[in-house]
């Protein structure tokens, strides 16, 4: 066998393999015998057609089959021996048979060779979220909202109330358009933006009050930016009249031991333990958020500083992944008429960053000689089991070591090792940060 590896780009190579008759002959004869046994040629019984006629009719398909089988076999042997890291399956670009030789040309993408920029001088700020009593009470209030009751209020609408009213639009002549009436529309004061004209007009109003609302749409330019007065077309404000019919207020239940049992499905039987768990869950959530935000900052910096060429097949793979993630968020399907092709194309830059970051993390693992052992998997399983006493540690270990889960768990462990290897070299300054508010 003769081989020649030719670089086509930093991420693509061509491999030429020349096999002698002794090397390709057995496979060729095997395919020829199979064709002789199975191919039916009119005028001849199966297996009795002249060899010359059989080669003439079935020869091209035999040659393709032989080229594909031997191409795959020798490609695997060669990349292993040459320590080549392919990024995709090799494609046969060309092949040629003679009586004495089979010449194969394979094209494939590779993980590029590159030197990682020194990152020991990088500095990052990590948020240190402090969960206090205020944050715990705020979270409990959110939980209680799902168990609250909407009751009618005779008081003026507050920032947490819902105003129910009949809305009518004024026409161009300044008269109310009865055809535009929307009865019993619910305006949630809590979730409308502070600058929303309906929120501004309805705050402090009671049942029976009538308000006029002027809504002026914001004109945007073709790029989605807010247009200036000079280049924007005149946008007519729309006037509405809203007659308040009712103000609803969410009445929260009292948090007691019985409600705790219901909310927690008997996990807790008293308020103190429930509050302690809420605090723990918040701390774990914001610790994870802090870690993820730091990782995002690190990856962004390292991707920016290391413009590594990325194999196209890797980028396309990440495009597919991002597309599927978006689809799952929409219950598995995009809306009818959605431009999937255009949407996929718009994600290419993001996909390229994901692919580049993957190459960088592989380089960090290689530089630090990081590996994942069975002991690592056991330790990972023990840590996960510690989060839930109901879990059986032996069963978790068996599951994590099973073929269905092993690669995924090993990848998770490797990511953590790479993260630790990076954070040990960079400077990370913790900064006390208020816990952000969130709404249901």
From Swiss-Prot:
Residues 160-253 form the PPIase FKBP-type domain. It is found in: Cytoplasm. GO terms for biological process: cell division; protein folding; protein transport. SUPFAM superfamilies: FKBP-like (SSF54534), Triger factor/SurA peptide-binding domain-like (SSF109998), Trigger factor ribosome-binding domain (SSF102735). Its EC number is 5.2.1.8. Disulfide bonds: none annotated. HAMAP family: Trigger_factor_Tig. This is Trigger factor.
């Amino acid at each position: 066998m003769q081989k020649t590896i030719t670089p086509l780009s930093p991420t693509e190579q061509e491999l030429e393999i020349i096999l002698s008759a002794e090397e390709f002959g057995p496979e060729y004869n095997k395919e020829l015998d199979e064709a002789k046994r199975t191919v039916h040629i009119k005028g001849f019984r199966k297996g009795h057609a002249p060899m010359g006629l059989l080669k003439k009719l079935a020869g091209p398909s035999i040659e393709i089959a032989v080229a594909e089988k031997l191409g795959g076999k020798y490609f695997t042997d060669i990349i292993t021996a040459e320590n080549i890291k392919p990024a995709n399956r090799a494609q046969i670009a060309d092949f040629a048979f003679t009586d004495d030789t089979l010449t194969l040309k394979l094209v494939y993408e590779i993980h590029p060779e590159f030197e990682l920029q020194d990152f020991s001088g990088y500095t990052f700020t990590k948020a240190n979220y402090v969960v206090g009593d205020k944050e715990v009470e705020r979270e409990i209030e959110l939980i209680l909202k799902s168990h609250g009751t909407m009751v009618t209020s005779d008081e003026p609408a507050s920032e947490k109330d819902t105003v129910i009213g009949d809305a009518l639009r004024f026409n161009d002549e300044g008269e109310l358009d009865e055809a535009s009436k929307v009865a019993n529309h619910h305006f949630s004061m809590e979730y409308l933006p502070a600058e929303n004209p309906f929120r501004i007009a309805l705050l402090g109003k009671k049942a029976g009050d009538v308000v006029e609302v002027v809504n002026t749409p914001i004109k945007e330019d073709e790029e989605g930016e807010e247009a200036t007065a000079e280049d924007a077309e005149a946008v007519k404000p729309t006037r509405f009249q809203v007659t308040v019919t009712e103000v609803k207020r969410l009445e929260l239940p009292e948090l007691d031991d019985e409600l705790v049992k219901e909310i927690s499905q008997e996990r807790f039987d008293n308020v103190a333990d429930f509050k302690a768990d809420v605090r723990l869950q918040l701390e774990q959530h914001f610790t994870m958020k802090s870690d993820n935000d730091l990782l995002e900052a690190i990856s962004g910096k390292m991707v920016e500083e290391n413009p590594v060429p990325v194999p196209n097949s890797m980028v396309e793979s990440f495009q597919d992944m991002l597309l599927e993630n978006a689809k799952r968020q929409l219950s598995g399907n995009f809306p009818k008429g959605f431009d999937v092709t255009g949407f996929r194309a718009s994600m290419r830059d993001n996909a390229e960053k994901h692919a580049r970051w993957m190459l960088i993390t592989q380089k960090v693992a290689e530089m630090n000689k990081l590996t994942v052992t069975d002991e690592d998997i056991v330790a990972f399983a023990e840590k996960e089991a510690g989060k839930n006493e109901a879990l059986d540690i032996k069963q978790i270990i068996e599951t994590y070591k099973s073929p269905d889960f092993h690669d995924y768990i090993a990848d998770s462990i490797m990511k953590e090792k790479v993260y630790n290897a990076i954070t040990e070299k960079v400077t990370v300054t913790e900064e006390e940060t208020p816990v952000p508010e969130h709404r249901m």
